[in-house]
Amino acid sequence: MLKYRSLPIKRAIHHPAPGITPISPRIMVSRLRVIPSFNLKFNRWNSSVPESSKKELKTTDGNQESASKVSPVKEKEKVPFKVKMQKALRHYWDGSKLLGLEIKISSKLLMKSAAGYPLTRRENLQLKRTTQDIVRLVPFAAFLIIPFAELLLPFALKLFPNLLPSTYESSKKRENKLENLRNTRKLMSEIIKNNKSHFKPNNISEEQKALFNRFYTHVRATGVPESRQQLIEVARLFTDDTVLDNVTRPYLIALAKYMNLQPFGTDVMLRYRIRYKMLELKKDDLSIYYEDAEQLSLSELKTACASRGIRSVDVEPSVLYSNLRLWLNMRLKDKIPSTLLIMATAYNYGNVQSKESLYDALCDVLIGIPDELYHEVKVNVVKEDEASAKQKLKQLREQEEIMKEEEQQEENAIVSVKDELSLDDQDKNIDAAAPDVKPHDTKPIGEAAAIKEK
């Protein structure tokens, strides 16, 4: 088919010489079989060859590079502001309905508890979560009561993201919080490994002193304990209060961050908050023990493992179930302090997959005391009459320096906290309530299908 793309042909057709009748486009197409390609919209001549034919011609002519060029990636389309507003309003509306439903359910649970009926672990968690959400509404209500204060609400939510109840939290923010917690725990795990912990057992008998001395002599020589039973018996000598009262401030801060606590305040305040968190874990251990871990749903199982410092991301449900049962076994059957278990999970964070690994991590925690503290403990292990007065004087001066430092922190603190909470006394009550029999975690590990998924 003839194409008139050259400039002389175009001028001859549309601007003929004087005395020559111009050819209309219809006659030109029907008789001369010429395709007109003048674009009236853009007032320019266009090629009548399709784009696909152009590419074929280029490739046949040997121009392979231009044909094989990758088209640039299209940018993501911007969501209109109206759509964003509708999505945000729908999210807050759903959160308000969810909060109203939680208040309705929790009010029934509160009436049930006031009537004297016991609440299950799931009901206690629901009541606690709703109470925390209602408390969060108190500062949020100030923005609605004070005139024009709602204009500052976006800035307040940016600075304090936990100002709103948990029902308004989006899935993206929840994932960001979990990711930040995982990164923090990885970092704190390294800090706990590198920082030596300064704690030692107190008020132990002569037989326990001999066991303690034999354990450290064998471990420092071979790197492993004589038996697992020996490791458990030595770990029982370190009570929660003994550990928390003798660790340094960097270790306290790392421990608080690992347990998802804000590390602000003096050492006394940090110890009190860690003790309170440990007490909640002890009670939760007993609740899971009585109700059996098999009754937990998958989301509840992940939450329970995460609160104990056990990795719960990218882990099979059967492995999570095994790790939780191992924790309960070491906590309630072996009666190992929760503080040491938290440190053990921090030592091998993300690698708690067998009983040997967690017991080995517990051994690493006990080995991690410094040499000078080991010599100090060795003085306490032998009879008091054999200890020199110089060694006792050095130990007493160290305790005096710690007390002076804590007193100075309390003087500079705005809020004074009196730490009278004793985990050891609470531990005696919890251990007395737990029967000394094989707990549920001694049963064979179930499959992932046995775990109920909501």
From Swiss-Prot:
Residues on Mitochondrial intermembrane side: 46-136
The keyword Coiled coil is annotated on this UniProt entry: yes
TM segment ranges: 137-157
Transit peptide as recorded in UniProt: 1-45
One Gene Ontology term, aspect cellular component: mitochondrion
One MF annotation (Gene Ontology) recorded for this entry: ribosome binding
Main location: mitochondrion
GO biological process per UniProt: potassium ion transport; protein insertion into mitochondrial inner membrane from matrix; proton transmembrane transport
Keyword vocabulary terms for this entry: Coiled coil, Membrane, Mitochondrion, Mitochondrion inner membrane, Transit peptide, Transmembrane, Transmembrane helix
Membrane topology: Single-pass membrane protein
Record domain Letm1 RBD: where: 177-371
Basic and acidic residues bias: start-end ranges: 420-430, 437-454
Coiled-coil residue spans: 376-423
Stretches the record annotates as Disordered: 51-73, 420-454
Localization in the cell: Mitochondrion inner membrane
Mitochondrial matrix-side segments: 158-454
Function: Involved in mitochondrial potassium homeostasis through the mitochondrial K(+)/H(+) exchange regulation.
Entry-linked PANTHER family: LETM1 DOMAIN-CONTAINING PROTEIN YLH47, MITOCHONDRIAL, LEUCINE ZIPPER-EF-HAND CONTAINING TRANSMEMBRANE PROTEIN
Other comments on record: Present with 11300 molecules/cell in log phase SD medium.
Subunit relationships: Associates with the mitochondrial ribosomes.
The protein, known as: LETM1 domain-containing protein YLH47, mitochondrial
